[in-house]
């Protein structure tokens, strides 16, 4: 924008919110500790290798590194905090950086911050947190890219590998939910979405290539 121009006003159509919640950046870290802001149960981790919508380019691309974002709702990507009535935001005062800078009429501010200083789980959980080691082990035993490769083959050893990975992924979630007493909704932040849930998207992405 020219310095003399006023920023375009939001028409509050809600389209950006329906396309998915924002990824979080380092600047958003204080919001996770702000009363009325999002908490860990409101987040989902998209892991390296997952197909995800690049909101700047407008297309699905596999992630090179993980991102943490506000989760969707009702089985869709519509932001958890989007309120259809009035096209309002339930956490407007504590909305993340991408929401603050986005204008669908001029996306240059979003483009400048989009891939910069994105938060990861290790940034959000304090050093020494007891679950960090388990998260790392899950990432090693259940990598998205490795699971995607196993989906490409119907060989007996690959079917066994898929079953073992799916079992490990399910068991670690059950274990943490039972032993910790945490809200089960936090599991999608800690371990990303279940591999079983990712399988259709990974298969569809493979067919597009």
Regions found by a protein language model. Name each.
Residues 1-208:
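Hydrophobic scaffolds flanking metal-cofactor catalytic centers in soluble metalloenzymes
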């Amino acid at each position: 924008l020219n310095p003399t121009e006023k920023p375009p006003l939001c028409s509050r159509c809600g389209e950006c919110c329906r396309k998915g919640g924002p990824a979080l950046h380092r600047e958003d870290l204080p919001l996770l500790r702000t009363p009325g802001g999002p908490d860990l149960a409101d987040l989902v981790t998209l892991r390296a290798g997952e197909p995800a919508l690049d909101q700047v380019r407008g297309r699905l691309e596999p992630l090179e590194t993980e991102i943490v974002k506000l989760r969707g709702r009702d089985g869709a990507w519509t932001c958890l905090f989007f309120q259809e009535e009035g096209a309002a935001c339930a956490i407007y005062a504590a909305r993340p950086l991408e929401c603050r800078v986005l204008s669908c009429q001029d996306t240059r501010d979003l483009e400048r911050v989009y891939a910069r200083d994105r938060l990861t789980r290790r940034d959000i959980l304090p050093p020494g947190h007891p679950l960090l080691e388990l998260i790392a082990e899950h990432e090693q035993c259940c990598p998205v890219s490795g699971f995607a490769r196993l989906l490409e083959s119907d060989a007996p050893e690959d079917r066994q590998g898929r079953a073992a990975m799916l079992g490990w992924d399910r068991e670690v979630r059950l274990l943490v939910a039972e032993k910790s007493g945490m809200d089960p909704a936090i599991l999608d932040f800690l371990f990303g979405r279940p591999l079983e849930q990712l399988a259709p998207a990974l298969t569809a992405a493979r067919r597009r290539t």
